[in-house]
Amino acid sequence: MATDTTEVKAIARFIRMSPYKVRRVLDQIRGLSYREALIILEFMPYRATEPVLTLLRSAAANAEHNAGLDRAELVITQAYADQGPVLKRFQPRAQGRAYQIRKPTCHITLAVAANAGAK
């Protein structure tokens, strides 16, 4: 009764981008097959697609090399972006003042598994 689903993860840490902007992209590919996600990411107009696309290819390579799974049968099971440390910088302003600039980072996690009902 127990199903043996091998889930393979890939994590990109300290990506210099807001997690909110990355989540907008991840929400579009969660639950899709590997090929569908590749096509969608190629044509999305957001800057966040670049690290997500790299990470998706890495997760597929991990699944193929470490678990012996076929790329054509992979499905994205988990996709989330956690907040990383915030780099704090200062912007000099008039009359000796300085404004704080926050440069957010995020940790992106993608998990793929073989599709149970592969065609």
Swiss-Prot record:
Keywords: Ribonucleoprotein, Ribosomal protein, RNA-binding, rRNA-binding. The keyword Calcium does not apply. Disulfide bonds: none annotated. One of its GO terms (biological process) is translation. One of its GO terms (molecular function) is structural constituent of ribosome. It comes from the Bacteria. CDD domains: Ribosomal_L22. Part of the 50S ribosomal subunit. PANTHER family: CHLOROPLAST 50S RIBOSOMAL PROTEIN L22-RELATED, LARGE RIBOSOMAL SUBUNIT PROTEIN UL22M. Belongs to the universal ribosomal protein uL22 family. This is Large ribosomal subunit protein uL22.
